Amino acid sequence: MAAKDVKFGGDARQRMLRGVDILADAVKVTLGPKGRNVVIDKSFGAPRITKDGVSVAKEIELADKFENMGAQMVREVASKTNDKAGDGTTTATVLTQAIVREGAKAVAAGLNPMDLKRGIDKAVAVVIEDLKANSRKITNPSETAQVGTISANGESEIGRMISEAMQKVGNEGVITVEEAKGIQTELDVVEGMQFDRGYVSPYFITNPEKMIAELDNPYILIHEKKLAQLQPLLPLLESVVQSGRPLLIIAEDVEGEALATLVVNKLRGGLKIAAVKAPGFGDRRKAMLEDIAILTGGTVISEDLGIKLETVTLQQLGTAKRVLIEKENTTIVEGAGSPDDIKGRCSQIRAQAEETTSDYDREKLQERLAKLAGGVAVIRVGGSTEVEVKERKDRVDDALHATRAAVEEGIVPGGGVALARASLKLADLGYDNGDQKVGIEIIRRALQSPLRQISENAGEDGAVIAGKVLENGTYNFGFDAQTGEFKDLVSAGIIDPAKVVRTALQDAASVAALLITTEAMIAEKPEKKAPAGAPPGGMGDMDF
């Protein structure tokens, strides 16, 4: 086991604080509409330019092990806030730095760190209640667009697109962000349920120009095993032919005699039919087939349930208004499933997503939820250069998460004002002893730091701006750093999601309190490397 280096008390806290400051100073320059960019060197390719706090935080690794521990703790704050709310990482970093700075001074002055922590926790609880009381629900698409615009650093086109996407696919819908090939940023919406499997054979195509198969008002057979023999299918095919409606077969695979006969019938015009493979693999495939069955009002034909293909009736088939089948995708539009069944299935998937510990599983469950709930929107981000596209994509991701958070828990005035106003609520908060009072005071000061930082990034004096904002009793009154004016921020469209502000404060206070109560730090001693040996001597007349 390698030897360890141990630091105690003030020495440990000082080193840790240096690490916190290095990381926070690099991140906080990005805060607000006039925040600056940070350029990050890459081991290959062009450097990356970003204004996204968490992207900057993730790149910072310090040589001194003790400083690095402080920096990594703040990085953890940014990551956690990003995971929970998707935005607010820079605000969380600024708050952490402010709380740790003041807290370290208080501990150095001999105050009890545990009482400081209790005071901090008390104050945070009061502020969160104040944020909840003052947040208001989003009522129209223009407010949704404003949240997106603020989070995308004032780019209104991004805000408008996100608002439009959410209108089309609903708040539960999946909105993915991709890099576009051209200069334009565009929105593409796929309504209905889409899965990534296309036709089994190109002979099923009905529209040769577009290379797609279109089925109007089809029956849908959902079968979890392979279809190789035609015999079990015959009774069902006869019923479908008599009904005069098309048939879509979704099965693990369709091959051999079954496929050949279906293709021949399709070409002769006797039967409008198409077959696609079932989406997903293993247990996920079963779950997705069940989703399709619920969406279309059908039944999964499975031997587990004791249903044999020979006995299937038309009542056990699903139906939909329209099905589009491309080479690699199938879209089911307006399935005929009962809305109550679909809602029930959505609740079940939502519960699974909350319980799972795997990010991958959660992402897949959310995709399934979106497909059931209404559709998928894709925002393709364009730009003149690759670096610009990546930078804009970061901002679109932030804006998307912020908008979702705003729909969830409502909005508060932006520009750091909601936290600054909440600091006034701490003036007469009760405490058990003097040290707790100092903890409350630490939070009271820290709550003004985001407002001050936004003002300083815009070239103003942070203390003066904070003073003017708090002198005015109107809750929504604040400083618009973009124009340099004081105004009603909510009516000017400068708003933050309450969830983002709440999460930033909770995560910052949690980690900062841990840093303040640290008394010892342990790190591995760097190994002393032996000096390299001298090169061998030359041989005789060999000149180099």
Curated annotation (Swiss-Prot):
PROSITE patterns for this protein? CHAPERONINS_CPN60
Superkingdom assignment = Bacteria
According to its UniProt record, where is this protein mainly located? Answer: cytoplasm
Q: What is its EC number?
A: 5.6.1.7
In the UniProt record, does the keyword ATP-binding occur? yes
Q: Where does ATP bind?
A: 30-33, 51, 87-91, 415, 496
A single GO cellular-component term from the record reads: cytoplasm
One Pfam family from the record: Cpn60_TCP1
Family membership: Belongs to the chaperonin (HSP60) family.
Q: Which PANTHER family match?
A: 60 KDA HEAT SHOCK PROTEIN, MITOCHONDRIAL (PTHR45633)
NCBIfam families in the record:
GroEL, PRK00013.1, PRK12849.1, PRK12850.1, PRK12851.1
Name the record gives this protein: Chaperonin GroEL
Q: Which organism does this sequence originate in?
A: Granulibacter bethesdensis (strain ATCC BAA-1260 / CGDNIH1)
Q: Which gene encodes it?
A: groEL
